[in-house]
Curated annotation (Swiss-Prot):
Location of this chain's protein in the cell: Cytoplasm
Gene Ontology cellular component terms for the protein in this record: cytoplasm
Protein name per UniProt: Leucyl/phenylalanyl-tRNA--protein transferase
InterPro entries: Acyl_CoA_acyltransferase, Leu/Phe-tRNA_Trfase, Leu/Phe-tRNA_Trfase_C, Leu/Phe-tRNA_Trfase_N
Entry similarity comment: Belongs to the L/F-transferase family.
GO molecular function, one term: leucyl-tRNA--protein transferase activity
Pfam families for the chain: Leu_Phe_trans
EC code: 2.3.2.6
Reaction equations catalysed: N-terminal L-lysyl-[protein] + L-leucyl-tRNA(Leu) = N-terminal L-leucyl-L-lysyl-[protein] + tRNA(Leu) + H(+); N-terminal L-arginyl-[protein] + L-leucyl-tRNA(Leu) = N-terminal L-leucyl-L-arginyl-[protein] + tRNA(Leu) + H(+); L-phenylalanyl-tRNA(Phe) + an N-terminal L-alpha-aminoacyl-[protein] = an N-terminal L-phenylalanyl-L-alpha-aminoacyl-[protein] + tRNA(Phe)
Role: Functions in the N-end rule pathway of protein degradation where it conjugates Leu, Phe and, less efficiently, Met from aminoacyl-tRNAs to the N-termini of proteins containing an N-terminal arginine or lysine.
Source organism of the structure: Shewanella woodyi (strain ATCC 51908 / MS32)
UniProt KW Cytoplasm keyword: yes
Signal peptide start and end residues: none
Protein's gene: aat
Keywords, sorted A to Z: Acyltransferase, Cytoplasm, Transferase
Length: 236
C-alpha cells in the first residue's frame, strides 16, 4: 500500500510517481514550495501541482495520463468553418500574465479556481526564465482566448486554457499543435483525462508508459528561437 510523502522547503527530490495513491488517483506528495527549481524538477519527473486555495500544496502524477501527439488534434468541419470566418489574430508569448489571469477567472461550471495567486506568481517566474509559455488569441486588441504551459525538452506540459468567445480556446489549442509540430516536439502532456480532452483527440496512457516517453523526450534539444515572442498564423 502506497503512502503519502511530505516535502519540506529544503529538498526538491520527489518520490517516484509509482508510489502515488490510487485514491485520490495520482496524489503523490504534500508540501514543499513552488520555487522554480522544484517546479522544474516536478515536470521533469512527470509530476505537477494542483490544489485549491485553502489546501496545502498537493503534487500529482495520475494513472492513466492524458496526452496528445502534436498534430493529432481532432477538428470538426464546423470548427474549421467557424475559425475561417473569424478576424482573429494569434501570438506566442505576447501576454503570458493576461493568459494565466484569464485561466484563473471564475467559471460557471466550477466552484472556485485552482489557479491561485501563488500558482500565478510561480508560473510567471517560470515564464521569465523562458520555461513557461503562452498562446494568445485576439479579437482586435482584446484577448479572447489562450493557453499556457511549460516545456521540458520536446515535451509540452499543458496547464490550462480559457476563452471569452466561442471556440477561441480550441483555436489556441490548434495553434499549439501546429507550432509544436513545426518545432519537432514529440508529446503534449494534458494531465488528467476528461471528456473534453477526449473529444479533441487526447489519448489515455498508463502512467508507466507516459513516464517512459517523458524520459525519451525530456532532454531532447529544441531550437533556440522555438518560443520567441511572435505573431503567428493559424493554418486552416
Amino acid at each position: 500500500m502506497n503512502s503519502l510523502s511530505y516535502l519540506n522547503h529544503e529538498l526538491e527530490q520527489f518520490p517516484s510517481p509509482e508510489f502515488a495513491l490510487t485514491d485520490p488517483n495520482g496524489l503523490l506528495a504534500v508540501g514543499g514550495d513552488l520555487q522554480p527549481k522544484r517546479l522544474l524538477n516536478a515536470y521533469y519527473e512527470g509530476i505537477f501541482p494542483w490544489f485549491n486555495i485553502d489546501d496545502p500544496i498537493l503534487w500529482w502524477s495520475p494513472d492513466p495520463r492524458a496526452v496528445f501527439v502534436p498534430g493529432n488534434m481532432k477538428t470538426s468541419r464546423s470548427l474549421l468553418k467557424h475559425l475561417k470566418k473569424q478576424p482573429w489574430r494569434y501570438s506566442i508569448n505576447h501576454a503570458f500574465s493576461q493568459v494565466i489571469e484569464g485561466c484563473a477567472a471564475p467559471r460557471s461550471s466550477q466552484d472556485g479556481t485552482w489557479i491561485t495567486p501563488e500558482i500565478q506568481d510561480a508560473y510567471l517566474k517560470l515564464h521569465e526564465l523562458g520555461k513557461a509559455h503562452s498562446i494568445e488569441v485576439w479579437h482586435q486588441d482584446e484577448l479572447i482566448g489562450g493557453l499556457y504551459g511549460l516545456a521540458t525538452g520536446q515535451v509540452f506540459c499543458g496547464e490550462s486554457m480559457f476563452h471569452t468567445q466561442t471556440n477561441a480556446s480550441k483555436a489556441a489549442m490548434l495553434l499549439l499543435h501546429q507550432h509544436l509540430l513545426k518545432q519537432g516536439f514529440k508529446l503534449i502532456d494534458a494531465q488528467v483525462m476528461n471528456p473534453h480532452l477526449a473529444s479533441l483527440g487526447a489519448t489515455a496512457l498508463r502512467r508507466k508508459d507516459f513516464i517512459n516517453l517523458l524520459k525519451r523526450f525530456r532532454d531532447l534539444p529544441v531550437a533556440a528561437d522555438a518560443w520567441a515572442r511572435s505573431e503567428v498564423s493559424l493554418e486552416l
